[in-house]
């Protein structure tokens, strides 16, 4: 959506770059083994992708563990989701598999801090934290990231 508060040419450039970036992240996530919508076409300001018919998961223990595994795969590929919460996961009505959606705030980064913020964001949103962490531990550098999550948590508590 165009932003009226931004100068027209700048707005068009930003929206176009963000559209291409999201499409690339979706493709990269799929290559990393993460279930997500398939990009069918990329226009200047829109992405046409496959439709995942389903519902938001309850994030029980099993789903939380799987969400942790999926984030581990994203982080192995240095993909930062940017808004990794249950609202951006869909349980397929057909297969029951979990799909990650909405990479609009995502980016590529090797930075442990960026990965820790992704983990922290999900941990704040779910009850089954231990299951999520158990799934995330399939990431080779999970210990380093989880240690940083504690630092992020302290900063957030202090800021509030």
Q: PLM ranges: what are they?
A:
Residues 1-20:
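ATP-binding glycine-rich loop module of kinase domains
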Residues 98-160:
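C-lobe/activation-segment region of protein kinase-like
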Residues 24-42:
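Conserved HxN/HPN-centered segment at the entrance to the catalytic loop
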Residues 16-19, 61, 113-116:
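Short, conserved loop/turn and helix-capping segments at secondary-structure boundaries
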Residues 44-56:
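Conserved short submotifs of the Hanks-type protein kinase catalytic core
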Residues 42-44, 84:
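Short Gly/Ser/Thr- and Asp/Glu-enriched loop/turn motifs at secondary-structure junctions
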């Amino acid at each position: 959506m165009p932003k009226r508060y931004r100068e027209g040419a700048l707005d068009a450039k930003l929206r176009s770059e963000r559209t291409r970036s999201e499409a690339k992240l979706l493709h990269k996530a799929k290559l990393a083994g993460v279930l997500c919508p398939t990009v069918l076409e990329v226009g200047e300001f829109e992405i046409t992708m496959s439709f995942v018919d389903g519902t938001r998961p309850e994030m029980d223990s099993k789903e939380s563990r799987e969400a942790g595994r999926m984030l581990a795969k994203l982080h192995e590929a240095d993909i930062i989701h940017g808004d990794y919460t249950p609202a951006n996961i869909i349980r397929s009505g057909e297969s029951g598999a979990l799909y990650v959606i909405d990479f609009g705030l995502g980016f590529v980064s090797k930075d442990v801090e960026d990965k820790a913020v992704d983990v922290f964001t999900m941990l704040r949103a779910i009850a089954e934290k231990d299951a999520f962490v158990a799934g995330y531990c399939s990431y080779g550098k999970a210990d380093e990231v989880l240690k940083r999550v504690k630092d992020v948590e302290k900063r957030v508590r202090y800021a509030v």
